[in-house]
Amino acid sequence: MEDMAKKDGVIEIEGVVTEALPNAMFRVELTNKHIVLAHISGKMRQHYIRILPEDRVVVELSPYDLTRGRIVYRYK
């Protein structure tokens, strides 16, 4: 994700959505085999980008809580 603006202290990692949960939450298995709970970023909600199980996504993780994240990109 070279063209996206980098935020300080945020970890970006790829993963695969394994399960869709209520309230636009998703369970994502990261490339390092960890499983995190993630929600959709505001820009993705604004543009009605749909996320389905088995989609490859980019997740932003905060260094303070590595079990929760934000989905910021869905690969086509």
From Swiss-Prot:
It holds the Pfam family eIF-1a. It is found in: Cytoplasm. Keywords: Cytoplasm, Initiation factor, Protein biosynthesis, RNA-binding, rRNA-binding. One of its GO terms (cellular component) is cytosol. Its main location: cytoplasm. InterPro entries: NA-bd_OB-fold, RNA-binding_domain_S1_IF1, TIF_IF1. Residues 1-76 form the S1-like domain. GO terms for molecular function: ribosome binding; rRNA binding; translation initiation factor activity. SUPFAM superfamilies: Nucleic acid-binding proteins. Component of the 30S ribosomal translation pre-initiation complex which assembles on the 30S ribosome in the order IF-2 and IF-3, IF-1 and N-formylmethionyl-tRNA(fMet); mRNA recruitment can occur at any time during PIC assembly. One of the essential components for the initiation of protein synthesis. Stabilizes the binding of IF-2 and IF-3 on the 30S subunit to which N-formylmethionyl-tRNA(fMet) subsequently binds. Helps modulate mRNA selection, yielding the 30S pre-initiation complex (PIC). Upon addition of the 50S ribosomal subunit IF-1, IF-2 and IF-3 are released leaving the mature 70S translation initiation complex. Belongs to the IF-1 family. HAMAP family: IF_1. This is Translation initiation factor IF-1. It comes from Renibacterium salmoninarum (strain ATCC 33209 / DSM 20767 / JCM 11484 / NBRC 15589 / NCIMB 2235). The lineage of its organism: Bacteria, Bacillati, Actinomycetota, Actinomycetes, Micrococcales. The gene is infA.
